[in-house]
């Protein structure tokens, strides 16, 4: 290839901040029997390239496929157990599944690259659909982000997660599969954050775990890298609604904190604390509805602070039972000083299977 063109491609590749080895060349003929070539990378604005240059951020951004600043962005990530060890601890019958909370992290990363001067505030109208499962050694996924609207304080970016249908020969066919969707809420630089929507659930009880982590993970499929629940402190109730208080673990407190091959990694969306909320609400669904449940949606997520120390506690309140085995929950996580850290308004869990009789339990409540 011409020197001038090679230099241009080299600079573009460096500015994209990718993590994998890349060869820039002209036609390779028989040297490329596996058809591993791809189009040149997108040109990125300096502020976007500057963010991507931070090694501990954006672990789910392998490359930018499309980018129209402040309008649309499409990022690509290749999921595999070596690069993302947490996948091995989120597997059913040996098949790894991408956790929904990590899809939210993908959305947050794509949205922040679309509006680089903003910071993450939360999520609205999240729906978890077709799961992403690794039936092969690796699975490519794309996060699509596009500008939705803004006001004086916030920018809203809508996101979807998709993957291609691929046959045994490695050929893409048909329309992309749609997995999850949600709206990322970003706070503008210099804007005053409006009063957050915190559910009226009271404060979780203090104390040691009445039911330890072993009790919880006898009932869940999560391995050590995804065992974010530190145990149940007590059963509780809020205005007649059944609730449960527990211990929430930070990533540094997990039984195995190596979730990524390139640790340390900074995550924008506090995904493991959202996961604690799901698991705590799931324990209530097990107890009251006798159902093993998975999250299918969240009405709103409020990210209130990034905790610097442990001692976090969680309370989830079962608000309603809807049709088809769906239960509705609100969740609040607080720090050791009772300051709110994270709020989940309107978590919907879908019952997937009845709880085995030997796994049923009942918490004491006043």
Description of each model-found segment:
Residues 3-22, 29-366:
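Acyl-thioester-processing domains in fatty-acid/polyketide/NRPS systems
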């Amino acid at each position: 290839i011409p020197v001038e063109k090679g230099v241009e491609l080299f600079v573009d590749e460096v500015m994209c901040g990718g993590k994998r080895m890349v060869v820039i060349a002209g036609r390779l003929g028989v040297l490329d029997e596996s058809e591993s070539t791809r189009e040149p990378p997108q040109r990125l604005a300096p502020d976007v390239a500057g963010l991507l240059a931070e090694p501990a951020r954006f672990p789910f951004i392998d490359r930018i496929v499309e980018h129209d600043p402040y309008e649309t962005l499409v990022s690509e990530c290749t999921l595999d157990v070596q690069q993302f060890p947490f996948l091995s601890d989120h597997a059913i019958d040996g098949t790894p599944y991408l956790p929904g909370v990590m899809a939210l992290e993908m959305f947050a990363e794509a949205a922040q690259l679309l509006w680089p001067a903003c910071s993450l505030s939360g999520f609205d109208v999240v729906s978890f659909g077709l799961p992403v499962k690794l039936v092969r050694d690796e699975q490519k996924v794309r996060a699509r982000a596009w500008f939705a609207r803004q006001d004086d304080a916030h920018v809203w970016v809508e996101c979807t997660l998709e993957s291609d249908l691929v046959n045994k020969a490695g050929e893409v066919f048909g329309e992309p599969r749609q997995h999850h969707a949600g709206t990322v809420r970003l706070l503008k630089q210099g804007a005053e954050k409006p009063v957050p929507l915190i559910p009226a659930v009271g404060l979780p009880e203090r104390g040691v775990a009445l039911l330890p982590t072993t009790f919880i993970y006898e009932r869940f499929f999560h391995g050590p890298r995804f065992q974010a629940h530190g145990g149940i402190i007590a059963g509780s109730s809020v205005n007649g609604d059944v609730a449960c208080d527990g211990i929430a673990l930070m990533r540094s407190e997990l039984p195995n904190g190596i979730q990524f091959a390139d640790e340390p990694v900074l995550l924008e969306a506090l995904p493991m604390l959202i996961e604690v909320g799901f698991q705590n609400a799931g324990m209530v669904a097990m107890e009251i509805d006798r159902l093993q449940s998975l999250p299918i949606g969240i009405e709103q997520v409020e990210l209130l602070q990034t905790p610097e120390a442990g001692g976090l506690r969680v309370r989830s309140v079962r608000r309603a039972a809807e049709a088809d085995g769906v239960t509705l929950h609100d969740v609040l996580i607080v720090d050791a000083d009772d300051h709110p850290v994270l709020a989940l308004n309107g978590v919907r869990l879908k019952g997937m299977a009845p709880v085995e009789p030997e796994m049923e339990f009942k918490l004491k409540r006043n």
